[in-house]
Amino acid sequence: AIAAVITFLILFTIFGNALVILAVLTSRSLRAPQNLFLVSLAAADILVATLIIPFSLANELLGYWYFWRTWCEVYLALDVLFCTSSIVHLCAISLDRYWAVSRALEYNSKRTPRRIKFIILIVWLIAAVISLPPLIYKGDQGPQPLARPQCKLNQEAWYILASSIGSFFAPCLIMILVYLRIYLIAKRSHCRGPRAKGGPGERESKQPHPVPGEVSDSAKLPTLASQLATPGEANGCSQPRPGEKGDGETPEAPGTPALPPSWPAIPKSGQGQKEGVCGSSPEEEAEEEEEEGCEPQALPASPASACSPPLQQPQGSRVLATLRGQVLLGRGTGTAGAQWWRRRTQLSREKRFTFVLAVVIGVFVLCWFPFFFSYSLGAICPQHCKVPHGLF
């Protein structure tokens, strides 16, 4: 029964991890640089399932090491190498998640395939450093029976503690602290919302709004925004509107449509407003009014033939005192809003992926903790804390 279960787990491990590698290498949506961690992790798990578990199963079923003595030493080194690499890969993935959540825009620009491959190389080097000592220093293995030879891990206390700390306890502690930090960042980000991030809603709420019926200081000056008020008054040319009389008479009839409240009020004649030269551009009028002052001109008989087309309000922008200020405000707000939404989407994606990895790592820690705890306990107090062989 045990052999059947272990055999099924071996096949399931090989098939499942092969699908992971195939999906990352063939799917366009999964070709992100950080998914190289998953490819390397899946490769380590496949090596464990093909080179380690079958020989461990045979050793447990037979009760002794049936294969060559040299292969026993290589087998033990590969066992430590692949298992340590698998654990350290999960630690590297957790650090990658933390940097992606805490510094999303900055880290994503630096998360290149070359950098990820370099981190993967460091992971394998760490695993190799931990697994090589048993090959170099074999220690006191004791007498080996000729009929039933054994293949056991290094029983030196210093190596047991060092390998347990480097292979499991240190990466496990790092992963727990990192995912706790990610949880706190995600929770704080969720509680703040767009206003705490300086989102577009907050910036728009701080913009001044003109009071209906009151002429603002900016409207009293011959600025460019005043030329946006009505199409006919652009470029210094006025056109009569329905229900509106000439100068000196009642300005508007009761049925005349009013200007939108967000548009600056237009000063009437006699309030210090000067009309620019008809047919000139808004920039030229502004420069002439600032330097020389624009003298009043008589209106032409045919406004339609003399006046240039009226300026249109940019879509999605706010009207302020000047046209230049209006354009800059609209573009700045849109850019800030796009950055905020891009960061929000990135954080949401990272948080979902982080949750899945947290579940995987939690199950992984629960599976590995009993072995490393009992393995380390045998080195700390070998006489009084001896773990039964069957439980180990």
Swiss-Prot record:
KW Transmembrane (keyword) present: yes
One Pfam family this sequence matches: 7tm_1
Keywords recorded for this protein, A-Z: Cell membrane, Disulfide bond, G-protein coupled receptor, Membrane, Receptor, Transducer, Transmembrane, Transmembrane helix
Single Gene Ontology MF annotation: epinephrine binding
Segments of this protein annotated with the region Disordered: 193-315
Membrane-side (Extracellular) residue stretches: 63-72, 141-156, 381-392
Alphabetical list of SUPFAM superfamilies matching this protein: Family A G protein-coupled receptor-like
Stretches with biased composition (Low complexity): 296-315
Site (Implicated in ligand binding): 79
Cysteines paired by S-S bonds: 72-151
Membrane topology: Multi-pass membrane protein
Cellular component, GO annotation: cell surface; plasma membrane
GO BP annotations listed: platelet activation; regulation of smooth muscle contraction; regulation of vasoconstriction
Biased segments, Acidic residues type: 282-294
Location in the cell: Cell membrane
Job of this protein: Alpha-2 adrenergic receptors mediate the catecholamine-induced inhibition of adenylate cyclase through the action of G proteins.
Subunit structure: Interacts with RAB26. Interacts with PPP1R9B. Interacts with GGA1, GGA2 and GGA3.
Family: Belongs to the G-protein coupled receptor 1 family. Adrenergic receptor subfamily. ADRA2B sub-subfamily.
Annotated protein name in UniProt: Alpha-2B adrenergic receptor
